[in-house]
Amino acid sequence: MRQKENISKNTADHHSEPKRMQMSNEEFLPFVVEQLQSHPHKTVTLPLRGRSMRPFLEDNRDKALLQYSAQYHVGDVVLAEIAPGHFVLHRVIAINADKVTLRGDGNLGIEQCRMTDLRALAIGFFRKGRTKADMTSGPKWKIYSAVWTRLFPVRRYLLFALHPHLPSCLKRK
């Protein structure tokens, strides 16, 4: 049985309850992209799946607040379609003309795509069940981003230490 995802589409009227829909994974992210492109001033709250943005964004715990953007910069966290139907939410680490290099905060490897493959900009994150987003424009996120991206040379060791599935011989008793 395939897992169903929930999507919340926030409207300009913040007093109304967000619209909730359920759909399969195959429909989910293309639907998000279509909503953002059709309504560029609205946001979509996307439940996060995967481990690529660890240690600060967790699988099935946190949510990204996405918005359409016409401009992207190094350091932005973006929703990108790196192959047809294959989406990632990763940080832009380099832009060279039309070529964009991405890396998940919890990854050591990179992905590449074109500027036209960037579908949305993460403008905030709902972490640890909170109802108030940590905005990417705020000091908390900027400090985290500056520190974590500069730690790339030792990230392999930090991620290993933070990984919840360490072999039992390495776990503290």
Model-identified regions with their sequence ranges:
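Extended hydrophobic leader/signal-anchor segments used for secretion and membrane insertion
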Residues: M1-K173
